[in-house]
Amino acid sequence: MEVQLGLGRVYPRPPSKTYRGAFQNLFQSVREVIQNPGPRHPEAASAAPPGASLLLQQQQQQQQQQQQQQQQQQQQQQETSPRQQQQQGEDGSPQAHRRGPTGYLVLDEEQQPSQPQSAPECHPERGCVPEPGAAVAASKGLPQQLPAPPDEDDSAAPSTLSLLGPTFPGLSSCSADLKDILSEASTMQLLQQQQQEAVSEGSSSGRAREASGAPTSSKDNYLGGTSTISDSAKELCKAVSVSMGLGVEALEHLSPGEQLRGDCMYAPLLGVPPAVRPTPCAPLAECKGSLLDDSAGKSTEDTAEYSPFKGGYTKGLEGESLGCSGSAAAGSSGTLELPSTLSLYKSGALDEAAAYQSRDYYNFPLALAGPPPPPPPPHPHARIKLENPLDYGSAWAAAAAQCRYGDLASLHGAGAAGPGSGSPSAAASSSWHTLFTAEEGQLYGPCGGGGGGGGGGGGGGGGGEAGAVAPYGYTRPPQGLAGQEGDFTAPDVWYPGGMVSRVPYPSPTCVKSEMGPWMDSYSGPYGDMRLETARDHVLPIDYYFPPQKTCLICGDEASGCHYGALTCGSCKVFFKRAAEGKQKYLCASRNDCTIDKFRRKNCPSCRLRKCYEAGMTLGARKLKKLGNLKLQEEGEASSTTSPTEETTQKLTVSHIEGYECQPIFLNVLEAIEPGVVCAGHDNNQPDSFAALLSSLNELGERQLVHVVKWAKALPGFRNLHVDDQMAVIQYSWMGLMVFAMGWRSFTNVNSRMLYFAPDLVFNEYRMHKSRMYSQCVRMRHLSQEFGWLQITPQEFLCMKALLLFSIIPVDGLKNQKFFDELRMNYIKELDRIIACKRKNPTSCSRRFYQLTKLLDSVQPIARELHQFTFDLLIKSHMVSVDFPEMMAEIISVQVPKILSGKVKPIYFHTQ
């Protein structure tokens, strides 16, 4: 109660003059109810003033009314005949009776009884407490009869408040607002339970006192035995506080004898078995009071250590158990475990420390390391990543500095063994990753027990045995005989062990910064690109969606390959007129004029000079002329006599040297080579099967657009029939992408991972996660062949162009003759590129054999990928993998022809 401070003394302020808020009036009414309990069986009043004097007057009136009603009941019972009483007892309703605010039966709204009902008999052995009126009737030998309820007095009061009379007597004298609030706040259910418990306890204690002869006070009978007014007041205050959303920290502590309810949200913390569902009201106050109670045998230090969000939280992060000493069962549990149904009441940091302390999402089983331990149980917060060092023994601890894209392909451990590698124990091989099969382990698994210092294998078809047959029909260099990835061409000089960093783009430490001199001649938008920095060349939007190929002369959009260079139509016509004409052009400046789309007509001299620098010649209008020129020279050499044989050889050598000095064909291939394409994969999201495969399909869609543009710019390709052009591209796109990806993996990451795109690099973990591990291993082995054979960029460009013409339908194309001629011309160009670097014919033949064997090895890999993509397209809806429209059309229409045998590849060697 609020007080006023006077000059020299403290005196209470009159309640009638006190100004309070809504909640202050509520609790003031509750306090007045507690201080003035009222009669034993009060009746509900419509309203009560806050003053104490008015409450006393109203209570006296209620007592007088109650006495009058009791007298009327006795008179009616005397007038009622025994036969009518028996009939009323037989016709009584069997349902459970509820007491109203004046002791009447409270019936449901749907039931309208036509006659009064008799109350059920009260049995003391069942724990029932008879009503006072019933006790009077029993003493006189009359059956108990309940009067009919009044019509108007009690109709305004809520029906649920009728249950509060026997247990909380002071509630009847409170205001009507309090009753409405308690009814709306769902506090009645809790008070009903407490009423039943109080009645049962009161009956048992009353019987014990009667047996011992001890007198029973009116206060004990009134509150049900051992309960007191202060205890009931505390329960009511706490129930109202919780139901109104107020804090319960300021309430009084529970007595040491009170027990903790099992349906409390804190009950599992203290070892109490939880109930089916926690109640929202008073149990929280009871549990809170019991947790804050300082009982005997519990120190202050233990009580201070309870709070799970303060001191215990720090200990939980350090790996210690969160102790809770709020009850006697706290010492036995010793661990703070919150139930899963109460996730809204707990902090995420409580279980993250214990769940993530020994968990690493990147301790995945790699192909060249020992078998990992069983994975930890799943966690609801599995999307959170913790990049801790790998902790799988000696072979795994060596990769502690590896990042997310780390690969253990270069680690050499004596105990590392993969499936099918002859591990000493069967348990080691059985605990290998589930995606490994027996065939995959033998064909593509890591080499177990390689010679020298290597236990790591190449992951390809070659095993670790000395007498293994080379799959490509040739002998690899001595440093690659053991199948070790990191042994060829001294990769550590330019490829450190850091692999690819965690950022979605490769870091400068893992990318070969020099592309070679073969890209210097192409000054297009992507020809002078250097992968020295990670984000300089990938952030612009035109990198993800590259524009059309530009003219090498003026930078305008190119219309095709003209006179040996990729140019626009304007520069094509200008070069033809300027080269064939006899007019000489002179520059008015210093021969360094800017030639672009808007200023290309300002200086014809600089424009013509730039055309020659790009490799444009009148003799390169058609690729046939070069072949015909060589055949003509060979025919002339064969028809001449022996004295002129030396002269013919000199002409042939001079022709080859001139061709090497002006590589028209290579200039075209270098100019039309597609740039780097990104997949748009979000590396910040967790790796999943659907995400990886959807990104691969999106990358295939983007690369397919570049393949079409690249094929149309190839010399001689437009001379094919239009249907033949479409068919060749649709049949060979998979092999072209695999071959180009193998080259990128060799040049960027030294064939240790699959470099699909700068933002989509597959390490061992992603290979397993994508469920195409065997195909990925074969593609990685293809990439390793570029290093073992030391493929030059010129050889790669020519082999890639030849790969376009390496698969046709069984029935043939519409213009099969011209297709065969075009394919033969590209084969001759590959032979010329080989002959430019080698003088010995035997060496040239061996090199040609190796390169053609490598081309043949692409076809089986492409067929496996065709089968995989076709099966994935059928199940795409079930596995949530997205397919772009063009990719889905090609896979659904053209791939079945390849799988059914209607379209077959052209092999150089017998398979």
Curated annotation (Swiss-Prot):
Q: Interaction with KAT7: where is this region?
A: 616-910
Q: Where in the cell is it found?
A: Nucleus; Cytoplasm
Cross-link type Glycyl lysine isopeptide (Lys-Gly) (interchain with G-Cter in SUMO), residue numbers? 385, 512
The post-translation modification note in this UniProt entry reads: Phosphorylated in prostate cancer cells in response to several growth factors including EGF. Phosphorylation is induced by c-Src kinase (CSK). Tyr-526 is one of the major phosphorylation sites and an increase in phosphorylation and Src kinase activity is associated with prostate cancer progression. Phosphorylation by TNK2 enhances the DNA-binding and transcriptional activity. Phosphorylation at Ser-81 by CDK9 regulates AR promoter selectivity and cell growth.
Cellular component, GO, one term: nucleus
Highest taxon of the lineage: Eukaryota
Bias regions of kind Low complexity — which residues?
Answer: 44-88, 192-214
The entry's keywords: Cytoplasm, DNA-binding, Isopeptide bond, Lipid-binding, Lipoprotein, Metal-binding, Nucleus, Palmitate, Phosphoprotein, Receptor, Steroid-binding, Transcription, Transcription regulation, Ubl conjugation, Zinc, Zinc-finger
Residue ranges of DNA binding: 551-623
Query: Which residues make up the annotated site Interaction with coactivator FXXLF and FXXFY motifs?
Result: 889
Give the span(s) annotated as Disordered: 35-164, 192-225
Region feature Interaction with HIPK3, mapped onto this chain: 563-653
Where do the record's region annotations for Interaction with LPXN lie? 543-910
Locate the NR LBD domain: which residues?
Answer: 660-891
| Role summary | Steroid hormone receptors are ligand-activated transcription factors that regulate eukaryotic gene expression and affect cellular proliferation and differentiation in target tissues. Transcription factor activity is modulated by bound coactivator and corepressor proteins like ZBTB7A that recruits NCOR1 and NCOR2 to the androgen response elements/ARE on target genes, negatively regulating androgen receptor signaling and androgen-induced cell proliferation. Transcription activation is also down-regulated by NR0B2. Activated, but not phosphorylated, by HIPK3 and ZIPK/DAPK3.
Q: Which family does it belong to?
A: Belongs to the nuclear hormone receptor family. NR3 subfamily.
Q: How does it assemble?
A: Binds DNA as a homodimer. Part of a ternary complex containing AR, EFCAB6/DJBP and PARK7. Interacts with HIPK3 and NR0B2 in the presence of androgen. The ligand binding domain interacts with KAT7/HBO1 in the presence of dihydrotestosterone. Interacts with EFCAB6/DJBP, PQBP1, RANBP9, RBAK, SPDEF, SRA1, TGFB1I1 and RREB1. Interacts with ZMIZ1/ZIMP10 and ZMIZ2/ZMIP7 which both enhance its transactivation activity. Interacts with SLC30A9 and RAD54L2/ARIP4. Interacts with MACROD1 (via macro domain).
Q: What is this protein called?
A: Androgen receptor
Q: Which organism is it from?
A: Pan troglodytes
What is the name of the gene encoding this protein?
A: AR
